[in-house]
Amino acid sequence: MEALVYTFLLVSTLGIIFFAIFFRDPPKVPNEGRK
């Protein structure tokens, strides 16, 4: 049961960090050209 809690905490933490970075720096991906 503890493993489930730890996994949930890990996933939620990663998700929060991911969303924080995503909203802080909105992905501006140019469809044409990498420059």
Curated annotation (Swiss-Prot):
It is a single-pass membrane protein. GO terms for cellular component: chloroplast thylakoid membrane; photosystem II reaction center. The gene is psbT. Keywords: Chloroplast, Membrane, Photosynthesis, Photosystem II, Plastid, Thylakoid, Transmembrane, Transmembrane helix. SUPFAM superfamilies: Photosystem II reaction center protein T, PsbT (SSF161029). The chain crosses the membrane at residues 3-23. PSII is composed of 1 copy each of membrane proteins PsbA, PsbB, PsbC, PsbD, PsbE, PsbF, PsbH, PsbI, PsbJ, PsbK, PsbL, PsbM, PsbT, PsbY, PsbZ, Psb30/Ycf12, at least 3 peripheral proteins of the oxygen-evolving complex and a large number of cofactors. It forms dimeric complexes. It is found in: Plastid, Chloroplast thylakoid membrane. HAMAP family: PSII_PsbT. Found at the monomer-monomer interface of the photosystem II (PS II) dimer, plays a role in assembly and dimerization of PSII. PSII is a light-driven water plastoquinone oxidoreductase, using light energy to abstract electrons from H(2)O, generating a proton gradient subsequently used for ATP formation. It comes from Ginkgo biloba. Belongs to the PsbT family. The keyword Membrane applies. One of its GO terms (biological process) is photosynthesis. This is Photosystem II reaction center protein T. Pfam families: PsbT (PF01405). Signal peptide: none annotated.
